[in-house]
Amino acid sequence: MSPAPTDIVEEFTRRDWQGDDVTGTVRVAMIGLGWWTRDEAIPAVEASEFCETTVVVSSSKEKAEGATALTESITHGLTYDEFHEGVAADAYDAVYVVTPNGLHLPYVETAAELGKAVLCEKPLEASVERAEKLVAACDRADVPLMVAYRMQTEPAVRRARELVEAGVIGEPVFVHGHMSQRLLDEVVPDPDQWRLDPELSGGATVMDIGLYPLNTARFVLDADPVRVRATARVDDEAFEAVGDEHVSFGVDFDDGTLAVCTASQSAYQLSHLRVTGTEGELEIEPAFYNRQKRGFRLSWGDQSADYDFEQVNQMTEEFDYFASRLLSDSDPAPDGDHALVDMRAMDAIYAAAERGTDVAVDAADSDSADSDSADAAAANHDADPDSDGT
């Protein structure tokens, strides 16, 4: 007999991933000192149970040392060169890499060589090829790699996955996901930014925010994409180089579920995820932005319920999960192989938008930024690793 919805959502924000015997502290080095690191990551770690920020790494010594004042636990401010040289390597146990997408690889490679656990922002890199190199570097060094899909530790998303798994909404049939924001008007009001440079970003909208409904659908369904179709449009010339200001894409999952996802970097800020099954539906709205009061609605049979629950900081949950897995000598998830599925799916989405046809995941053969061009971007001093992203 399947559990009732009231049983599954009891203690809605419970940390089902946390064991009773977890003790200790993981010391974290922040790689990249942009606004996300300063305003979100460092405060989230400061509020966590199992980790603390001890090292910050930035483009200049002055900036790095100045950032040591952000919290008392920070003891070292390093330049990127000093990080690569292994300076103060004994002062941290793990790194959080939050540079532009196309610069993740060199910092993860260094962290792996130093034997440090890695929490790397999503997407893994600006191209599939570089993402594969990143995963291989951690595998060779036998260091844990977790990719920062913070929705996977968001309680509303975890409860949604449990409800789907328990069959409360029957067999999943459709997923509708959406995420939009006004990038140039409200987030980063500068057209000369890394998100609009295809060599550094890999793409503006699918790679930055379209990834949220894609990966969250994967997690809730416990399924992987096998085929996609897509349409992309550009209205603002600032997006011409990347080619995807607004995007709509469809996904066929290996369990038979169909998804329709939309994303825009120039539309009203909004996010939602809806899963419709043969016997019911669940909806999370707003879904993806941190520090917003999440709504959760479940409809099943002839009943419906809106759940009011204590809100959490998604970043604090993510860091505590990562640290708790390291402290219990367990592999953190989602890992690099999981993230590579998204990289290949997004590659296929871009190819589908360009060709106007369905594309099988793993068979995109697209013209996305290759390793050489991304290496060149990394060598460009104008590509500031402190211009972080999520």
From Swiss-Prot:
Signal peptide: 1-22
The family this protein is said to belong to: Belongs to the Gfo/Idh/MocA family.
Compositionally skewed regions (Acidic residues) per UniProt: 364-373
Principal localisation: secreted
GO molecular function: nucleotide binding; oxidoreductase activity
Tagged with keyword Oxidoreductase: yes
Cellular compartments per GO CC: extracellular region
Keyword Signal listed: yes
Reported consequences of knocking out the gene: Impairs growth on D-xylose as sole energy and carbon substrate.
Expression induction or repression: Transcriptionally up-regulated by both L-arabinose and D-xylose via the pentose-specific regulator XacR.
Protein name, UniProt field: D-xylose 1-dehydrogenase [NADP(+)] 1
Enzyme class: oxidoreductase
Subunit structure comment from the entry: Homotetramer.
Record region (Disordered): 361-390
E.C. number: 1.1.1.424
Pfam families noted in UniProt: GFO_IDH_MocA, GFO_IDH_MocA_C3
